[in-house]
């Protein structure tokens, strides 16, 4: 029986943006269908399920986290079955994500889940959902996914946007907290934000003025945030 007051939501609220951005970008190129909506929901549900699975291994009184794992894990399992029934090739995707999650678990067991390498694995897990959102609407109903060589160039542009934004945000947050006493890392974060702005604008240029403007505003904001907030590093607690 779960302990009284057992949490059912992860406390890391910033992670939700990491989940939402790739889903939105994937829907922009792949379209919104019942299957893509179900995939998006399943991807979001997987995060709290994985959080509580790690928490059971990581923290004292693991019974506190069993309720959250049951709620999110069972919901995610139902969604996974429905998705695999509709797109059997998602079974291979699930296996790849299981391997990636095993890496997350290994870092958690070593009490090193905040390492840069573990962050990189989480970013890859998030960014990969962009092409998967496209593929799920491509109509393939067997064990072989649709050929990604047939995907529009827009897909890879938006995937690159997701990668740049998530890597930059991860570096920015680390520069404010875990690396707050490391001016070199803070400068590296700011340089990456500047390079991301230039790269994203170059990628958006072929798609017209509106795409160029939206991209410049989005990545320009990330650069300004890095420069302004980077002056006063935060202190934990």
Description of each model-found segment:
Residues 20-23, 68-78, 120-135, 187-200, ...:
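Small-residue-rich segments of transmembrane alpha-helices in multi-pass membrane proteins
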Residues 1-16, 60-68, 105-124, 176-192, ...:
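Interhelical loop and helix-boundary elements at the membrane-water interface
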Residues 42-52, 98-108, 126-128, 161-172, ...:
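Alpha-helical transmembrane segments and their membrane-interface exit regions
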Residues 24-39, 80-92, 128-158, 199-212:
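Helix-coil boundary and interhelical linker segments in multi-pass alpha-helical membrane proteins
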Residues 124-193:
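Long hydrophobic alpha-helical segments that form multi-pass transmembrane helix bundles
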Residues 78-133:
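Hydrophobic alpha-helical segments and helix pairs
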Residues 186-237:
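Glycine/small-residue-rich hydrophobic helix-like segments
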Residues 1-94:
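N-terminal topogenic module of multi-pass integral membrane proteins
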């Amino acid at each position: 029986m779960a302990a009284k007051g057992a949490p059912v939501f992860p406390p890391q609220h910033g992670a939700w943006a990491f989940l939402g951005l790739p889903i939105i970008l994937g829907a922009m190129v792949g379209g919104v269908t019942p299957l893509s909506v179900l995939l998006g929901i399943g991807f979001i549900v997987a995060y709290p399920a994985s959080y509580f699975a790690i928490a059971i291994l990581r923290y004292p009184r693991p019974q506190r986290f069993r309720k959250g794992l049951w709620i999110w894990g069972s919901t995610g399992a139902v969604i996974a079955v429905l998705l695999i029934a509709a797109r059997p090739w998602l079974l291979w995707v699930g296996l790849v994500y299981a391997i990636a999650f095993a890496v997350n678990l290994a870092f958690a067991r070593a009490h090193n889940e905040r390492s840069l390498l573990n962050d990189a694995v989480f970013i890859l897990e998030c960014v990969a959902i962009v092409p998967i959102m496209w593929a799920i609407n491509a109509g393939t109903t067997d064990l072989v996914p649709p050929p990604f060589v047939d995907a529009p160039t827009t897909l890879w542009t938006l995937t690159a946007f997701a990668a740049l934004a998530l890597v930059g945000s991860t570096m920015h947050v680390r520069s404010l907290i875990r690396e707050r006493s490391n001016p070199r890392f803070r400068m590296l974060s700011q340089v990456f934000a500047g390079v991301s702005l230039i790269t994203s604008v170059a990628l958006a240029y072929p798609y017209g003025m509106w795409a160029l403007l939206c991209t410049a505003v989005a990545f320009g904001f990330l650069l300004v945030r890095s420069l302004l907030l980077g002056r006063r590093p935060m202190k934990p607690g």
